[in-house]
Amino acid sequence: MNPKNLLKIIEEVRKFDDQMEAQAIAVFFYVGTYGYNDGVLMQQIQKDLSLGQSSVSRNVYKLADINRHKKKAIGFLYTFDDPMERRRKKVSLTSKGKRVFNSLKDLAS
């Protein structure tokens, strides 16, 4: 990816939250890339991005509709129980998240 395109992507994401950290952006792009339709397991995000469970949870909630303090958040992601194993959580894009992801994906190319 062209570094100029990467900077454009970061600028666009930060329009939603000017304090958004690189980890949160990485989680958003991971979910958009690997869990666009069916979602992705939180454990898989941990493993593939080499993040701890608390880091993944914190970043997912920053990007969700409601954060962990029960306040309105960005609204890019939502979590749900894995239908195959209810103890596991999956993460997917909201319709807003899909719109933003698609527009950012276009910037990357």
Listing of model-derived features with the role each one plays in the protein:
Residues 64-82:
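A short, conserved structural fragment
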Residues 18, 82-83:
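Short polar/acidic secondary-structure junctions
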Residues 2-18:
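Short, Lys/Arg-enriched N-terminal segment that forms or immediately precedes the first helix
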Residues 60:
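DNA major-groove recognition helix of helix-turn-helix
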